[in-house]
Amino acid sequence: MKCLFLVCLCLVPIVVFSSTFTSQNPINLPSDATPVLDVTGKELDSRLSYRIISTFWGALGGDVYLGKSPNSDAPCANGVFRYNSDVGPSGTPVRFIGSSSHFGQGIFENELLNIQFAISTSKLCVSYTIWKVGDYDASLGTMLLETGGTIGQADSSWFKIVKSSQLGYNLLYCPVTSTMSCPFSSDDQFCLKVGVVHQNGKRRLALVKDNPLDISFKQVQ
């Protein structure tokens, strides 16, 4: 059964509305909103595609990619994996769709967002590009990341990018019920960390209690 979480409550009605609301300047981002940066120090742009890469090298490295889930009856590749090393294929490009996208093209730390594999695909597989968290996998004791999500869906498709305590960034899974309630909340008590588990010899992204995946972002040229 999929885990259920309480909705995040804000102390103000809508934190994305600035106290300086005027007819000339109706909406501002929170003053403490910090842009997410790529490996070159540039701010992420929702119009561009990126590869999610590891902050480490060798056997500790490896890009994130779209692959076929073991024992899945889905008609398209629907698993979110990480290569076993940074030596080898490049990862599958993604784009980030922020819940505050009406403010511009920037992507910010602690912002609720969707993640989509930015690839050409058939009509049949279009719905298998949006990330989500799947049902509980009893054999692995956790919930695995997969595709088949929905942009704006409040249950299984919301993530956050947060600064890592080590290097780069971490991903959090944050199933809140409304993007307008807390789109920039830094209270992550309702979020779970995204890390890696081993599934049939592959590294599969999944929800973890410890050792979250440390990642960076490299723009696809």
Curated annotation (Swiss-Prot):
Induction: By infection with Phytophthora infestans. GO terms for molecular function: serine-type endopeptidase inhibitor activity. A motif (Vacuolar targeting signal) lies at residues 25-30. The record marks 95-96 as: Reactive bond for trypsin. Synthesized as a single-chain precursor which is cleaved to form chain A and chain B. Residues 1-18 form the signal peptide. The keyword Disulfide bond applies. Its main location: other. InterPro entries: Kunitz_inhibitor_STI-like_sf, Prot_inh_Kunz-lg. Residues 19-28, 179-184 form a propeptide. Belongs to the protease inhibitor I3 (leguminous Kunitz-type inhibitor) family. Heterodimer of chains A and B; disulfide-linked. Double-headed inhibitor able to form triple complexes with target proteases, by binding simultaneously one molecule of trypsin and one molecule of chymotrypsin. The serine protease inhibitor PSPI-21 comprises two protein species with pI 5.2 and 6.3, denoted as PSPI-21-5.2 and PSPI-21-6.3. They may be encoded by two alleles at the same gene locus. This is Serine protease inhibitor 1. It comes from Solanum tuberosum (Potato). The lineage of its organism: Eukaryota, Viridiplantae, Streptophyta, Embryophyta, Tracheophyta.
